[in-house]
Every structure is written in structure tokens, then in C-alpha cells.
Amino acid sequence: MEILGGPHFAVAGAGESHGPAVTTIIHGSPPGFRIRRCDVQPFLDRRRPGGNKHGTPRNEKDKVVFLAGLYRDDTDALLTGSKLTVDVDDQSFETEGYEDGFTTGEPIAAIVLSTSKKSGDYTQFSGPTGEVRPGHTDLVKFHQSKGFVDVRGGGRSSYRSTITDVIGGSVARIILRECFGTRFVSSICQVGSLKSKQSLADTLTIDNIDEIETSLGEAEIASIDHEFANEAGELIKETRKRGNSLGAAVEVVAVGVPPLLGQPLYQSLKVRLMGALGGLNAVQSCEIGSGVDVIPRTGSENNDPIRSSGYQSNTHGGLLGGITTGSPLVARVGFKPTSTINLPQDSVNKRLDEIEFELAKGRHDPCVGVRAGVTLESRMAIELLNSVLAYQATAHCGDSIKLF
């Protein structure tokens, strides 16, 4: 079974790129936290295709409807808002979704409909003579499933599946912010060979986070380095015109992180975070803290000084021995160039006959890192909340999560 997070807080999903909808089930949410649809929707808006001129031309509205796991005695407030209509056997059925309620501790269910599909664009890849796109899962998934695979838009392997990540992560970050003041922010720090001259981790504080979030939310390229963002936007535009694609790197930071979370070895929070972030579609690398920059340093240069007030620097990225220190969690995630390009390439069909492949039709992102930040934030939030609940499950009564 594929789940994100777990065992204490976990998210599961279903749905293909060109299926009717993407569904989400959230397990382990503690009771008593207020979840409003209007607080979750902005995170999906950041993720959705068509919301950024540098992304895919596919334009989905991605409006979420909550179906289970929320309640309040004021049922007008609970139900007033979203509706779901289904036509079956020449009959129409309508029901309300949950708009504003409190978690009950039961599984939370949500659905997002898929309404902007051009499935005819993918006949090129159908059946045993279907062509294989280099860099995609076409070949391995076809043979793994004995040919029973949905080729439209990548099927279940599509980035559309991350709707589930963002819904689950939205609930996790609402709970973490209410309990600890934890906040999550991301900034694009590299596109192709262009690199940002500013680091989010070096800039972000609890005091300036609202200003930075507003600035990032208004930008086409969500980077704190505006000069870099403008140059990156032009580079993406020119690369798309040439039918090619670009890689990217995204810095993800969480502030207000409780200390003492995680395990030291096989379930360390470092292992889990690197797995969650590194397992996202198209990710090729994941670094914690200063990452590979620590390699040429000496120990005296790299160790973070400690005083009674806490750590004086954060080379360790908020994790030591897989356990949080209370310093900001810092990760840098690298994405490969989008595999779908409009240029001739050597490939095969699914019977392994050699061909010269050229894309007939399709819609895709020229740089997948552009809208990946919110998904990375969401995955970090899910793993962090799972670690909080794991800590609380083994803590002595009355223990608070405190180090300094």
C-alpha cells in the first residue's frame, strides 16, 4: 500500500491524470482542529496546472470538496458552500461538501475533479506498439502491469497525483501552525545553469515570514531573488520555444519547528524527509542543511556553535542524528529537466523495436520545479506532523517538546 507519512499521520490517494477525479484520504488527524475549505484551496491554487505562464498550458481549476472527517453542530456553516452533482442512469444526484468544520479524529476524505483533459493526445503511446517517451515511466510501467496501464497524461505517475500531497499537507500545516507556530516556505534557487544569489534559509525569520510569503505568492517565479527570477523566467520562455526543457532546484524551509522529533537510525526524520522529498516526481537530489557544501570544510568550520540560548548557526539544517534541534528545517531539492520535449530522440516502442521518437501532441511543463514548492512544503509538513504524533505517543504525561 502506498501512503505518504505514517503510521501516525498518513495520506493516501487515488486517481489518474485523465481520470474523473483525484481522491484523498487523510488518516490520523487529531480531533478538534478547525479546517476551512477556503484555507486549503490557496495551496491547491499554487499547485494547479494553468496557474502560471511558465508551466503547462493545461488549465485545471482544482477546487477541493471535503466529503468526510469534519463536523460542527452548526450544520449551516458546515455545509454552506461546495456542492457535488453526479449524473447516473439518467438521474441527477446532488450533495453538499464540508465547507467549515472541525476534525473528529476519523479519516478525512476529499475530492478534486479533473475537467480539462485532452486524452486523444496520448494515442501515440497506446498498446504494445505504443511509443516510449525517453525519461518517462512508459516502458517500465507497461511491462510491470502486463500492459494494463493508463497512458493518458502519465496515468497515476502524473504530477496530478500530488493533489493528495497538497491536501494532506494543508491539513498538517494548519495543525502544526496552531500547536507550535510552524510555517513552511519554499523558494526556487536554480533554473538550468542560473543560480540565485540569495538563500531563503539565510533570509527567513518568524518576523519577516509574512512579507516573504506575500512577495513569493505574487511572483511568476517564486524566488526571493527577484533579479534571478526575471532571468529564469526569460530562460524558461526561450527554452520552451526551442522545444526543450530545464531542471531546477527548490529550497524548502520550515521555521517554528519543535525540537526532539524523530528517531536516530532507520526511522530518523532525515531518512523520512529525504525519502518524502526525494521521492517526488522528477526529483534527482535532496540535500539537508548546507548539503554538499560541507564536503570541503573542516570540522571546525562546519560545526554549529551552541550557547544556552540555542544553536548559533544552522549548517545542520535543523537535524542532528535524525532528530530536530529546534532550528529551522532546511532542504534543497533538485529536479531533472522535464522529460517531455518537442525534439527528435532515439527510443523504442513497447515491443522494443527501435524508433526515432518525436512527440505528436501533449501539454507539459517546460520546468517542473516552477510549481513544485507547495508540494515539497506539504510533504515536509506531513512528515513533521507524523513525528510530532510519534513523540507524543511515547512521551510521559505532562512532557512538553522543549530543548533550550
From Swiss-Prot:
Belongs to the chorismate synthase family. Its EC number is 4.2.3.5. It comes from the Bacteria. This reaction introduces a second double bond into the aromatic ring system. FMN binds at residues 156-158, 281-282, 321, 336-340, 363. One of its GO terms (biological process) is amino acid biosynthetic process. The keyword Ligase does not apply. It is an enzyme of class 4 (lyase). Reduced FMN (FMNH(2)). One of its GO terms (cellular component) is cytosol. Homotetramer. HAMAP family: Chorismate_synth. Keywords: Amino-acid biosynthesis, Aromatic amino acid biosynthesis, FAD, Flavoprotein, FMN, Lyase, NADP. NADP(+) binds at residue 47. It catalyses: 5-O-(1-carboxyvinyl)-3-phosphoshikimate = chorismate + phosphate. Pfam families: Chorismate_synt. This is Chorismate synthase. The lineage of its organism: Bacteria, Pseudomonadati, Planctomycetota, Planctomycetia, Pirellulales. Pathway: Metabolic intermediate biosynthesis; chorismate biosynthesis; chorismate from D-erythrose 4-phosphate and phosphoenolpyruvate: step 7/7. One of its GO terms (molecular function) is chorismate synthase activity. The gene is aroC.
